[in-house]
Amino acid sequence: VVFTNEKIMKSKGIKNLLIDLGGVLINLDRERCIENFKKIGFQNIEEKFCTHQLDGIFLQQEKGLITPAEFRDGIREMMGKMVSDKQIDAAWNSFLVDIPTYKLDLLLKLREKYVVYLLSNTNDIHWKWVCKNAFPYRTFKVEDYFEKTYLSYEMKMAKPEPEIFKAVTEDAGIDPK
């Protein structure tokens, strides 16, 4: 995570920070996720789980257009195999690694001087895992790091669509200069 010098930020009148989750705060392991899906029988996962952009059922889930149950059913259908919700969730959540404690400490420090928001393309399954496993640190939990969280699956839109940024800035009362 690269943060601009604090004096420069203050001199430019920066009061609000909009932070991303995936690949910025939380470490990701796409290969581990693919391997774990293969272990449960999803052999052509690479074709469905694109490197640069999610599409199909993965994007639908990220935009909250389908429920976690519908996502799991879609995975089973693509696999042509019955596997449990628990197996699918474990494989899917293996994409997520951790949030290093230095980043959590930095978020807490930033909260002292800035209004910090989270804007993330994520889904219900991943968000529950992150809240339970990645954000808890010392006595802190996700609510302690951010003024508000904006999650693609709740907002029914995803980055880089301009609409999501407009919705966030309007809701938060931020002037995006």
Feature-to-residue mapping (PLM):
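N-terminal amphipathic/basic-hydrophobic helices that include classical n-h-c signal peptides
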Residues: V1-I8
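Short amphipathic alpha-helix with an adjacent loop that forms part of the alpha/beta core around
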Residues: M9-K10, E170
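N-terminal helical cap/lid subdomain that shapes the substrate entry/recognition surface
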Residues: S11-T101, D105, E112, N123-W129, ...
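Surface-exposed alpha-helical segments enriched in charged/polar residues
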Residues: D105-L108, E170
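Short beta-strand/turn micro-motifs composed of small residues
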Residues: S120
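Substrate-recognition "cap/lid" segment bordering the active-site pocket of phosphatases
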Residues: D124-K177
